[in-house]
UniProtKB/Swiss-Prot annotation:
The keyword Transmembrane helix applies. It is a single-pass type III membrane protein. Keywords: Apoptosis, Host Golgi apparatus, Host membrane, Membrane, Transmembrane, Transmembrane helix. Belongs to the gammacoronaviruses E protein family. It comes from Avian infectious bronchitis virus (strain UK/183/66) (IBV). It holds the Pfam family IBV_3C. The keyword Membrane applies. It is found in: Host Golgi apparatus membrane. This is Envelope small membrane protein. GO terms for cellular component: host cell Golgi membrane; membrane. Plays a central role in virus morphogenesis and assembly. Acts as a viroporin and self-assembles in host membranes forming pentameric protein-lipid pores that allow ion transport. Also plays a role in the induction of apoptosis. It comes from the Viruses. Residues 1-11 are virion surface.
Length: 107
């Protein structure tokens, strides 16, 4: 870096070198401002999509599930089958559950 400044001082003189350095700082400042504006715009965009799409979508999905499939899953008979008769260890179950339908035993 000092090599570059020394070379500029030799070729252009101190005034032009100072102008170049000042212009470089102004360019860095403007780049920072542009980056800040971009980040703010991206943040506002993300906040908009989260507020108006993601949250209502999740709430709507939960509402639909609660009032459709959720009601079906709250059936006490189904719950008793799941809790009491469903095989406990999946595919490795050696004694499958026995289900009764009208007094007939089904396995």
């Amino acid at each position: 870096m000092m090599n570059l400044v020394n070379k500029s001082l030799e070729e252009n003189g101190s005034f032009l070198t100072a102008v170049y350095i000042f212009c470089a700082f102004v360019a860095l400042y403007l780049l920072g401002r542009a980056l800040h504006a971009f980040v703010q715009a991206a943040d506002a965009c993300c906040l908009f999509w989260y507020t108006w799409v993601v949250v209502p979508g999740a709430k709507g999905t939960a509402f639909v599930y609660k009032h459709t499939y959720g009601k079906k899953l709250n059936n006490p008979e189904l719950e008793s089958v799941i809790v009491n008769e469903f095989p406990k260890n999946g595919w490795n179950n050696k004694s499958p559950a026995n289900f009764q339908n009208d007094g007939k035993l089904h396995s």
